[in-house]
């Protein structure tokens, strides 16, 4: 597989930066929304947090791009004052690793299975961190339905957003020559 081009790296960084800003806005909306809707709100929005590595990997489909996009988004989110601190970096690295694994399994094809696996792996990887950090490794029965919602969001919210954004980027010509440009 060829190395990433300068254009691919720059586009990934720009996407990561924009998504990092979105994450920051969502972080501050999350506080009052979770108070009103409970912990399920985070699980419903999980797919949005999977956006940077998944969009980057869908567009370019080269090893390392998913983690790079995730780290850029996390750094921008952190620099803009995320209330979650350094945990943002860890969560995004885990999401990026999940997407990298999923796309490697499907041999870097941008098919629906890549999104399904990304959503499942991303939910599991980040839940493992949450389980240790936030739940003191104490299993509680409410975690099962939350995990199901997280997985579904990781698959469907991410899939819909990535497809919409990729379609818009194709129309601009920004992704001309990228792997996604060859898709129908």
Segments predicted by a language model, with ranges:
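Short helix-perturbing small/polar motifs within transmembrane alpha-helices
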Residues: 11, 21, 90-130
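Membrane-embedded alpha-helical hairpins and interfacial helices in multi-pass inner-membrane proteins
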Residues: 38, 108-184
């Amino acid at each position: 597989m060829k190395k990433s081009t300068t254009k691919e790296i720059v586009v990934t960084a720009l996407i990561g930066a924009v998504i990092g800003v979105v994450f920051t806005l969502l972080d501050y909306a999350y506080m009052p929304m979770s108070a009103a809707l409970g912990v399920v709100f985070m699980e419903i929005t999980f797919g949005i947090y999977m956006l940077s590595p998944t969009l980057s990997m869908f567009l370019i489909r080269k090893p390392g791009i998913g983690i790079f996009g995730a780290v850029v988004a996390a750094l921008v989110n952190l620099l803009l004052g995320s209330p979650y601190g350094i945990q943002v970096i860890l969560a995004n690295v885990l999401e990026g690793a999940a997407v990298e694994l999923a796309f490697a399994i499907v041999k870097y094809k941008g098919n629906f299975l890549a999104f399904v696996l990304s959503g499942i792996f991303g939910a599991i990887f980040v839940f493992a961190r949450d389980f240790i950090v936030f739940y003191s490794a104490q299993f509680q029965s409410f975690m099962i339905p939350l995990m199901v919602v997280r997985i579904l969001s990781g698959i469907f919210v991410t899939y819909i957003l990535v497809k919409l954004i990729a379609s818009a980027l194709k129309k601009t010509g920004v992704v001309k020559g990228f792997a996604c440009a060859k898709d129908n």
